[in-house]
Design a protein with these regions (language model features):
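Conformationally flexible catalytic loops at phosphate/diphosphate-handling active centers
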Residues: 146-149, 153-208
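Thiamine diphosphate
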Residues: 30-104, 274-277, 282, 286
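Glycine-rich phosphate/diphosphate-binding loops that line cofactor/substrate pockets in enzymes
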Residues: 10-18, 60-65, 151-158, 197-212, ...
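Hydrophobic or amphipathic alpha-helical targeting/insertion segments
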Residues: 78-79, 85-128, 157, 161
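Conserved thiamine diphosphate
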Residues: 66, 113-160
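Glycine-rich, anion-gripping cofactor-binding loops and their flanking helix/strand elements
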Residues: 80, 215-305
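Short, small-residue-biased leader/transition segments that mark boundaries at the very start
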Residues: 2-8
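Glycine-rich beta-alpha junction loops
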Residues: 102, 166-172, 217-219, 246
Length: 306
């Protein structure tokens, strides 16, 4: 079943270990506020005035040395966050700014108090995303991606605030959802990260029964890369997908552009051969495998190498 964007945010905050929330309760952020107040993993602080709440969160984040959430209702209430958000940006303090919003279709139509909140903090946040209203599975996956992208920027090459705008047509105050689906957390792994983090990935490769490496478009492929692919293929018994535009020659390589056309392969058959891990690199992938795998988002791990 589909979950609202506020639930999507809540569960990803937990995955990232962000559990301190400074709340300025209003009508539009009721679903988020109530859901975290009822969750024992969250630490909630009520500060009615949004400007004061922002500065309180800034000090709290500095004291805890970890990100803190601020949440408010829609419209001009969001403008009160401006001073503390600017302060957090220039001090490099990680704050998750959650602004509830109204139906985007009603912008400029004399909707009560409605203002344009998309990207409102502009160059004073490290990342700003505007969530979709969730009506189907694709909306849900898109929402998950945007929340992950925002939270990852809290501490990527520096620290600072991020902005997540949460539009809604109306808010659900029935609170009758008992369980939520497992959520996906994005991880970023860099060459200079600890050996322990890299060993975790190695262990996953060892345990995986099906590994697929997809080679995207590339104009120059070094002999070292081709040798590495051959070694990886032999060591992990993986499948390697290459296309004409990949410009990679591997004896055991598969051209999935030929055998994975969505017009001829039904989802049921794709699911039978779904990999445990997909590792992709290079440029664009022309094969219909992208469209096929999107139907099973969350059922396998995807490692993007850049």
């Amino acid at each position: 079943s589909l979950v609202g964007s506020e639930m999507c945010i809540r569960d990803r905050l937990k995955k990232y270990g962000i559990t301190h929330c400074v709340l300025s309760a209003g009508s539009r952020n009721v679903p988020f506020v109530h859901s975290i107040e009822e969750d024992p993993e969250f630490h909630c602080y009520s500060v009615v005035d949004e400007r004061s709440a922002g500065y309180f969160a800034l000090g709290l984040a500095q004291e805890l040395n970890q990100p803190v959430v601020i949440s408010c209702t829609s419209s001009t209430a969001t403008c009160n966050y401006w001073p503390p958000v600017a302060e957090a940006f220039y001090q490099g303090v990680p704050i998750v700014v959650l602004t509830s919003d109204r139906d985007p279709e009603m912008l400029g139509q004399w909707e009560d108090q409605m203002i344009d909140q998309v990207g409102m903090y502009d160059r004073h946040v490290r990342k700003s995303v505007n969530l979709p209203i969730i009506n189907n599975h694709d909306d849900e996956i898109y929402c998950q991606r945007l929340v992950n992208e925002a939270l990852m920027e809290l501490n990527h090459h520096g620290t600072g605030p991020v902005h997540i705008n949460v539009p809604m047509k109306s808010y659900n105050n029935s609170f009758n959802v008992k369980t939520l689906p497992e959520v996906t957390k994005f991880d970023r792994l860099c060459l200079d990260d600890s050996d322990a983090l890299w060993k975790e990935k190695i262990e996953k490769l060892k345990k995986a029964k099906r590994i697929l490496v997809t080679c995207g478009q590339g104009s120059f492929v070094s002999s070292a890369l081709q040798e590495s692919l051959n070694e990886f293929f032999k060591k992990y018994n993986s499948a390697v997908s290459v296309e004409y535009m990949s410009n990679i020659e591997i004896e055991e390589g598969l051209n999935l552009n030929v055998c994975m056309d969505a017009r001829y392969v039904i989802p049921k058959k794709v699911k039978e051969f779904l990999p445990d891990i997909v590792i992709s690199f290079g440029g664009n992938i022309f094969a219909g495998i992208k469209e096929q795998f999107r139907k099973f988002a969350g059922e396998f791990e995807h490692w993007l190498v850049q």
